[in-house]
Amino acid sequence: MTAVKATPTTPPPRLPVRDKAAAGERGWGGVSPMLTRLAAEEATGVLVRERGSLHLVDGHVVHAESPSAPGLELLLTAHGTLGAEAWEAAARATDERHATTRLLLDGGLLSPGALELCHLGALYDAAYFVLAPSSTPGRFRYGVTHPIGGVRPVPVAALERETLRRRDLLHRVWPDAATDGAPLV
């Protein structure tokens, strides 16, 4: 730390202030500086945080998991879009070359549109909780991939923008902080 001796002719140095206009133009406000850095370096792996994890491929988020949000499997199987047996069979057949979702699409068991809709819903719901303020630092494991596979990669800026949009919406509807961390029902 550098100490600056202030005299009547020398004002103290200005403190850095975040430029909110520039943050808005970027599309993200720094919800997770670590995630922003990983996106900039186009990292592949998994970011594990207190409330879940985000899977990245080449700096884009391809999957998110949180115990507070329904996963892709539940969204696809809950209302008959896909049979639970078909999901389980594809998950068992998954290997390094064949992702679960690719097996379902190639087998004609799932349409690309239904998969993308459910995937984005599950990803954004889980990311909302994963990116919530945390009392512990996140950890990133390079090179880890998810067996579901990448359906539609989401840029980090879009993910953070959606997380902030959801926080703002929830705060406007119900300004009690207790609802911010409650699991989705």
Sequence positions of predicted segments:
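Acidic, Ser/Thr/Pro-enriched low-complexity segments and adjacent helix/loop capping patches
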Residues: 1-185
